[in-house]
Amino acid sequence: MKTLTVHTPSHSYPIFIGNGLLPQAGSLLKPHLGKRAAIIANETVAPLYLGTLQTALDAAGVSHFSIILPDGEAHKNWQTLNLIFDGLMQNRAERKTTLIALGGGVIGDMVGFAAATYQRGAPFVQIPTTLLSQVDSSVGGKTAINHPLGKNMIGAFYQPQAVLADLDTLHTLPARELSAGMAEVIKYGALGDIGFFEWLEQHMPELMTLDREKLAQAVYRCCQMKADIVAQDETEQGIRAWLNLGHTFGHAIETEMGYGTWLHGEAIAAGCVLAARLSEQLGKTSAADTARLAALLEAAGLPSAPPVFAFEKWLEHMSHDKKVSGGIMRFIGLNRLGEANITEITDTDILRRTLQPYL
């Protein structure tokens, strides 16, 4: 097991990374739990891992109850959030009751938002069970639900008490979900570590077959990079925005196609290539870098091109992006592979040229 610590102005917390950690969750997490916990999982993850977690909490003397939600991005909304609140209130959860998010990014985001708002703030713990959530969404305190007009538009910055990433849970992931998570892994190399990007190019076949050692290295490096960035910029006033590489285009894809039609990681993969193409148009990166990024994403079983839809739809969705400031769209681009930048776009013609092959 490896342990990282995330330091933020609000508080510091550990990330536990390793194999076989879920049966140890009670002892590992007990210092970060109250006397009572609410386990929130979805109907897919609960049959796989809920029993193991319940047994671990019983052994640690932590009382608990469970709330089971429908599965999928399409349910990341007010209605499902209210199911969490219903379960908490029906079980008389108090302000010190710890919410435990057992699942992927959708569960983690919703449980975090529920924790941020239930009785004006309850503690929560992340137990991510997908690659995407282990390397990205479980760390850093971004919580949210979707709105029909835009992804993650309603939420809060609210840090967990701890994160426990058991790599064994990745063995039950469908191949498509594993690929989707790999998009975020590749994103880290592209935005800030060319050495890691090159390592991914070398070891992608082993990663896609869940090589234990290589997978642990990749998850640890991603969490390390995110922890370093979050420590410097908890609420995304500056460099934390780099972590949104590909997300402005990607969120537009998810919104246009309907939440869950394209998995988040699939949309981010295509979005990263579009961000590189935009940087090419601005003279900031090379066609060779864009091709190299696309090739690595494709090696992970990911799309490197977006679906086709009207330019006006792209603009409509991107105008709702959370990085928009003073009506000006801000994109995360690349100076080169391994070095991100923040670019303001006032001339939509350059966006049209970037997207032209897909209109």
UniProtKB/Swiss-Prot annotation:
Binding site for Zn(2+): E184, H247, H264
Domain of life: Bacteria
Listed name of the protein: 3-dehydroquinate synthase
Swiss-Prot/TrEMBL cofactor(s): NAD(+); Co(2+); Zn(2+)
UniProt record similarity statement: Belongs to the sugar phosphate cyclases superfamily. Dehydroquinate synthase family.
Key word RNA-binding present: no
Enzyme Commission number(s): 4.2.3.4
Species classification: Bacteria, Pseudomonadati, Pseudomonadota, Betaproteobacteria, Neisseriales
Any single Gene Ontology cellular-component annotation: cytoplasm
Ligand binding (NAD(+)): 71-76, 105-109, 129-130, 142, 151, 169-172
Cofactor note: Binds 1 divalent metal cation per subunit. Can use either Co(2+) or Zn(2+).
HAMAP family, A to Z: DHQ_synthase (MF_00110)
Cellular compartment(s): Cytoplasm
Origin species: Neisseria meningitidis serogroup B (strain ATCC BAA-335 / MC58)
GO molecular function: 3-dehydroquinate synthase activity; metal ion binding; nucleotide binding
InterPro entries: Dehydroquinate_synthase (IPR050071), DHQ_synth_AroB (IPR016037), DHQ_synth_fam (IPR030963), DHQS/DOIS_N (IPR030960), DHQS_C (IPR056179)
A Pfam family matched in the record: DHQ_synthase
Listed GO biological process terms: amino acid biosynthetic process; aromatic amino acid family biosynthetic process; chorismate biosynthetic process
Keywords from the UniProt entry: Amino-acid biosynthesis, Aromatic amino acid biosynthesis, Cobalt, Cytoplasm, Lyase, Metal-binding, NAD, Nucleotide-binding, Zinc
Pathway of action: Metabolic intermediate biosynthesis; chorismate biosynthesis; chorismate from D-erythrose 4-phosphate and phosphoenolpyruvate: step 2/7
Catalytic activity: 7-phospho-2-dehydro-3-deoxy-D-arabino-heptonate = 3-dehydroquinate + phosphate
EC class name: lyase
Role noted for this protein: Catalyzes the conversion of 3-deoxy-D-arabino-heptulosonate 7-phosphate (DAHP) to dehydroquinate (DHQ).
The keyword Cytoplasm is assigned to this record: yes
